[in-house]
Amino acid sequence: KNATIVTQSADFDMASEGVMRSAFGLQGQKCSACSRVYVDKRVAEPFLKLLVEKTKALVIGNPAQRDVFVGPVINKAAVEKYERSVAAAKRDGSLLIGGELLQEPPLDRGYFVSPAIAQLPLSHALFQEELFLPFLSVGIVDSFDRALEESNRSHLGLTGGLFSNDEREIERFFDEMEAGVLYVN
């Protein structure tokens, strides 16, 4: 359950592209996928707008085709977990995009779901679950300190990401983030 932090000094185009690619590349079915993003409340609206736009533009289909970015999830159990996660997001937060099982030809010959982005309360269980799905949980925070605290609140932490142009934030991230591999910008 890898976390990324987006601060008010971030380049939002770069941050939205990086988060989208990390969350939804290989359908989120990789150990290094970004599953949680913590966004400074002062920049949440413009960042999330770009993230949703970029996610909406993703091509879903046969991953062997050149222009396809999102392929199928692995099996029916993954679809069921996706549907439970979407239902929880709708019930407890706000689903910004996604949530559909895609069954129109040619997507009817596989387990295709639309990449989902959900804004949730910071205490929500989905921030702690390792889903291995194209599902991104968004938490809005009021400070960089809170973003670091929330990022480190998981017992999982293979990778951690930061989008910031503030050198002090970058230094603190490298010193305080509890993850094996760290990425900046």
Predicted feature residues:
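Conserved C-terminal structural/oligomerization subdomain of aldehyde/semialdehyde dehydrogenase
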Residues: 59, 105-185
